[in-house]
Amino acid sequence: MASVPVYCLCRLPYDVTRFMIECDVCQDWFHGSCVGVEEDKAAEIDLYHCPNCQVTHGPSVMRKRRGAVKHADVGLGRDSGRPVKTGSAQFVRELRCRTFPSADEVLLKPTGAQLTVEFLEERSFSVPVLVLRKDGLGMNLPPSSFSVTDVEHYIGTEKEIDVIDVSRQADLKMKLGEFVEYYNSPNRDRVLNVISLEFSDTRLSNLVETPKIVRKLSWVENLWPEESIFERPNVQKYCLMGVKDSYTDFHIDFGGTSVWYHVLRGEKIFYLIRPTAANLSLFERWSSSSNQNELFFGDQVDMCYKCSVKQGNTLFIPTGWIHAVLTPVDCLAFGGNFLHSLNIDMQLRAYEIEKRLSTADLFKFPNFETVCWYVGKHLLDTFRGLRENRRHPATYLVHGAKALNNAFRGWTRKESLGEHEQEIPDTIKTQQLVKDLAKEIRLVEDIFQQNIGRSGTPFGGSQGLPSPHPKAQLNTPLTFSQHLSKKRGPKPKEAFGGGGVGPPGAKKKSQKGKEIKTEAGELDLLEIHTKHTLKKFQPGCKVKKSKLELPDDCLDDFEEKINKSKLKLVLTNGKLQGKKGRAGSANGAGSSLQQFQPHMATLSDFDSEDELQIDETPPPRRRPSLPSKKKLAGLPRKLPRAKPCSDPHRIREPGEVDFDIEEDYTTDEEMLTMQGVKGGAGGILDLLKASKQVAGLDSALSEEAPASPSTRDAIQGMLSMANPPSSSSSSSSSSPLSISGGGEMMGLMKEKGGREGWMSGVKKSERKAVFQRPGKRPIKRPARHLSDDESLDEQETLGTCFKDSDYVYPSLESDEEDHVSKSKMKRKRNWDDTPWSPKARVTPTLPKQERPVREGARVASVETGLAAAAAKLAQQEQQKTITKRKYTKKKTPQEKVHSTVAQLQHQPDSAPVSPPLPSEPPVDCIVEERRVEVYSASLLDHEYTAGPGPFSPGGPRGSGAMAPGVFLTSRRPSLSPQNSSSYSPSAPSPGGLVTPTSAGACQGKRPKKGLATAKQRLGKILKIHRNGKLLL
């Protein structure tokens, strides 16, 4: 077995942890500690002679300095051919003499108690923060008498540390005991600086506690799992020991981390550069240049600020700030780095710059990508939780999540997965996380766009400090709740012409454009609603900066009552729910609101494009109500309301906005009972008023403006087609709502341009509308996102029902849990429900596409519709011909022949059918014909449901209801509008109409092709295609 080679005077084997130097004479290796050669000084030796060789060859030969320059002849290095090196004594002297802009221009200087998460959220932590005293910061530090000797005592003399040789800007390793000896020596031959002594795992850690704000924001402190197989990054606690004239060149802290410094003894001077896109590009170019140590980066940027941190001061430097540090006197300081969620995008940009510059691992954030994966999972859970609780994340959190998700996509690409795979935790499913996080971000952005509007920058530009009052005032423009929709809602500070109604003792600012600070705990919800209303209902004559002028007495009275009552209200399903014992106050405030009604009556209509927005995440079994064309006076509906945290004990998490955003889900019926209805004659309200006798509307509605006779006839025809016995339609049992189970209706919507469109109604909780305006495409309301399970259940439930492709059938929501209460509500609501719905769907008429036709196939619903139309027309003819005026006209010879043959073949129970070519009917008959034609389409769209009528067991004819699939030819002849007695002037009686039953019965002119039989003519009149579908 070969022996292990030994070296040096001590004749020990090679030790990789000990510095060794080779003798240039005997070629033997010696430990530096054994021959008295320090590692940092070895570079100055040109030829080394070991102690044995020094006897024969003399001492070691040192390197000669070439072209030594006298410092007195050098300015900034520009007067001579050789520039000044960074960190040299001349460089430090020149740096001390230079003038820089003061950092007071950009610094924030709060007290320790004011520096909270909310403080940094409002200002996005985008500028440095200097705290003059440590009181209130929540950190523990040794006393000011603590020295480097004490550091050695708590950490250990043999602790190997990284030291920077300032003059050469090079790294070297030393034992802590050696550095302390150098630090305490009066004669120092060089300048050494310690900036990377992390002591989290030492006894010194028990004496130092990081600031409370750092512990709250730090990713590693809060999100790093204890069971992680990766090594926990320890970058929170550093001890910085520097002697006079120590200098650290410009840099960005690793991983884009933010950093805190507290000077325990001495002083440090920071040179700060803002991380703009241009400055970051210049920094990357400067860092990769070959003459970096000859260029002062502060000369290449527009602004370099100087900030002096004295003993007892604490400085917080935000993400990405480029900074250099000069130590004018011996200094002992503590600091640390931390990642946070306030500026994720900048952290990732700094990390990418590090990678492009090939930074050594020693100066990188350990396991940076692993931390990011844990944070991504946390953000996904946060977004889901906030959305389920109807609370919204702050803007900076959404932007940070988007940047983080984009980084995840880059790290998991096939071509780059190899170099990033080792930092991915095993508990993270990367592809699923990227997909789910992108979905949550999309949902949040949709909510922002529809309910709150697109906000500009995440935070306002104000840098003012909160009031030192114990109840810190909330700088409202800096919270996300201020960014309400520019289209749909005002900012709370703009209501009442810029003056807010605040709690007693609160200061008021009437100057325009100034921010109004309101104490969060004192905000009145009713006041916010009123401010929303006054801002929303602005006169149409002024597009911008218009204010609603109200009498001073109304405002004073309203303000006085609010201040007296101190209302604390919660909006539940559009109803004001006050606390116990405050009903009288609520009523008083409601009476004050009534004073505003006369002034709101002059407000103009709103553009429907601004109003057709709904929340995508309403509560489960409830759909938000839609605003009508005419906005009802009073409190606004579907407006996001900024409400302080309803739970006084709720702790707002970082990244959550201070205000809850709430929507109003008041139904149309509730709004009609609470507020007056305003509309013009000939509009939609005329249809409601004309049908009040059927739907049980309040008689006060019809007294304002009576409907025209034609409109009333149209309504009566519509109701009679939906339910044959029109005489009993006023009762709840025979109304069209009760026939279809109390939840469906048909309506006729008259639009602004005078056109009429059909609306097929659905349940109030399921309405979605498309308002068709003249000359414009339909405006559709965005539907809320349904889960996959809900969609599948609806499709399975409705899959067997007949559906016409020309109509859109809104989905039905499940109500298994509360079907009992809903059924009671339906029965109670049937008697006063209206036949017109502003939320019914009206779809545009599109060209029909060719479909495959099966020969001999018959559609059951079409046959049923034909039977219903024929029976109804027969009953109408019998009723109308009794009182109608008979029109006699001279018959043509051909008509006489038809009349004679028909009378010979007439049977008592035969259905009346007109000749193929009837003469022109009177005007009244034409109106009736058009109405019946249109209603036939709606009958075919809905399955016929039996009720008290001619086809029911209790009907006049005594026959059962027409079942689907039973054809007209086997029951009774068909009836068409043109075959009624009102169109046949020659008809002697309602039952004496002519019926050509065979080709031989009529000896006159041969009928047209396709019109030979009654069924063909009826199909032609009703515009039914041969395959049983409607032709629109």
UniProtKB/Swiss-Prot annotation:
Q: Identify the coding gene.
A: phf8
Residues the entry annotates as binding Fe cation: H251, D253, H323
User: Know the name of this protein?
Assistant: Histone lysine demethylase PHF8
Q: What happens when the gene is disrupted?
A: Morpholino knockdown of the protein results in defects in brain and craniofacial development. Embryos show delays in brain development at 24 hpf and apoptosis in the developing brain and the neural tube at 30 hpf.
- Native organism: Danio rerio (Zebrafish)
Provide the JmjC domain boundaries. Answer: 199-355
Listed CDD domains: PHD_PHF8
**EC identifiers of the protein:** 1.14.11.27, 1.14.11.65
Pfam families assigned? JHD (PF17811), JmjC (PF02373), PHD (PF00628)
Q: Where is the composition biased (Basic residues)?
A: 620-632, 774-784, 882-891
Instruction: Name the SUPFAM superfamilies for this protein.
Output: Clavaminate synthase-like (SSF51197), FYVE/PHD zinc finger (SSF57903)
Which stretches does UniProt call biased (Low complexity)?
Answer: 583-592, 699-710, 724-739, 970-990
Region Disordered, as annotated, extends over 455-515, 577-660, 697-857, 875-923, 943-1015
> Per its record, what are the GO molecular function terms?
chromatin binding; histone demethylase activity; histone H3K27me2/H3K27me3 demethylase activity; histone H3K36 demethylase activity; histone H3K36me/H3K36me2 demethylase activity; histone H3K4me3 reader activity; histone H3K9 demethylase activity; histone H3K9me/H3K9me2 demethylase activity
Composition-biased stretches, type Polar residues, lie in: 473-483
Cofactor(s) needed: Fe(2+)
Q: How is the cofactor bound?
A: Binds 1 Fe(2+) ion per subunit.
Q: Which family does it belong to?
A: Belongs to the JHDM1 histone demethylase family. JHDM1D subfamily.
Q: What is known of its domains?
A: The PHD-type zinc finger mediates the binding to H3K4me3. Binding to H3K4me3 promotes its access to H3K9me2. The linker region is a critical determinant of demethylase specificity. It enables the active site of JmjC to reach the target H3K9me2 when the PHD-type zinc finger binds to H3K4me3.
